[in-house]
């Protein structure tokens, strides 16, 4: 991977900074929370997708310490973590509506 990065850097005259490894371990998200969020989404006719993710962020650290966790993702036209990253405000507001609704009414 380092060789590929070096090729890209040379070709594009850019520099990658990979940062420190977090060494966080993969974790399963909480099935009860997933069901609550899924049911709320359905009740509001907001399409949702349950999927595995390699993203860890803080949720995997919390989950590995026994803290019930899950992650909500906002649909992103060009994928995340790239210069062309783009999110439609409609999709952002749908996730906000679900998060706010669950926190306000279900938890």
Regions inferred by a protein language model and the residue ranges of each:
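Hydrophobic pocket-lining residues that define ligand/cofactor binding sites across diverse proteins
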Residues: 9, 41, 103-106
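His/Asp/Glu-rich mid-to-C-terminal helical/loop segments that flank catalytic regions of hydrolases
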Residues: 2-4, 74-107
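Acidic-enriched catalytic cores of C-N bond-cleaving enzymes acting on peptides and small amides
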Residues: 1-15
């Amino acid at each position: 991977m380092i060789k590929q990065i070096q090729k890209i850097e040379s070709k594009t005259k850019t520099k990658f900074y990979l940062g420190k490894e977090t060494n966080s371990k993969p974790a399963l998200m909480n099935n009860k929370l997933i069901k609550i969020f899924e049911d709320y989404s359905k009740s509001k006719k907001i399409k949702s997708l349950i999927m595995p993710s390699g993203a860890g962020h803080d949720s995997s650290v919390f989950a590995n310490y026994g803290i019930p966790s899950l992650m909500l993702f906002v649909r992103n036209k060009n994928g995340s973590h790239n210069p062309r990253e783009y999110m439609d405000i409609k999709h952002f507001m749908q996730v906000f509506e679900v998060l706010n609704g669950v926190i306000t009414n279900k938890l």
